[in-house]
Amino acid sequence: MRRVFACVCVLGCLSTSAQEARKPAPRDPGPDSQYRLGPDSMPQEGVPKGEIKGPFTLPSQAYPGTQHTYWVYVPAQYDPAVPAALMVFQDGQAFKNETGDMRAQNVMDNLIYRREIPVMIGVFINPGRRPDQPEPTPRNWGDRDTNRPTEYNTLDDRYARVVTEELMPALAKDYNISKDPEMHGIGGSSSGAIAAFTVAWERPDHFRKVLSNVGSFVNLRGGHVYPEKVLAAEKKPIRVYLCDGRNDNRGMRNGRYDETRDWFLQNVRLMKALQQKGYDVNYAWGMNNHGQKFGGAILPDMMRWLWRDGPVSTDPNDAVERDFRRPAVKKD
């Protein structure tokens, strides 16, 4: 009887071992698996919601034959009598996507309400396209069928002209936006990030805050030379937050390594050049791939840091300062 029992146990163990062997090996967590949006990126009960207006179409003089689609975020606290700050996001469709990784409108709603950033007009602008080309979407950002590569990756002032000479005058017709360049920020992801940096680099008299997520400071159209440009040029009055990941595109092409196309390396190089030159620069290096998971998770912190020096009252009797920002009173 003991022998029979022993045989049964052995067979049972063998059967269990065979079943375990057939199970797929546990998958390693992906580089983006640890990043989640926090409460600052979600709609919160009691927080006034801003309004997104648009889409609007802006014909371009800088790139004849093309047009830019954009949307305008107007916070509930916007008062036309008070000049507002300005934040411009490239690849606007991705930054305003309600189910995407950034959800910038929610971030602005929450941080404005808590006085952690100033009241600001937000702009979500897409790359230019001809009228016969498709509008970029969260699935197709337009690299193959719009003017995105030319506008965003080229190191010249043409896209800066779109923002400063075409977009900003259009906004000024409808909104009271501060003329102080310290109150103007610009940001983006990937090629949209280097585009944002280039706008501030070319026009620091208009933009002085740059938000860069997985910025394409690589040799797509010469962006890898920015560290050398920073070191060679006179220091400019801009503040920069760089965000990238160790698993971004790392420069392997056809089995060969090309450091000029290593996103992470080139972001680190730019950070070091900015530090060496004495710029006001902050940075965060994650584990992320080339995308917006990490950038979206820390977007509230990036915005707080960029806009940290807004005016503040220290009067203990200032009841307004010690209260949340309430919606502006609508005037008839």
Annotate the PLM regions.
Residues 1-4:
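Positively charged n-region of N-terminal signal peptides that target proteins for export
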Residues 6-13:
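Bacterial N-terminal signal peptides
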Residues 14-18:
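Sec/Tat signal peptide C-region and signal peptidase I cleavage site
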Residues 19-332:
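Non-catalytic cap/lid and distal C-terminal segments of serine-dependent acyl enzymes
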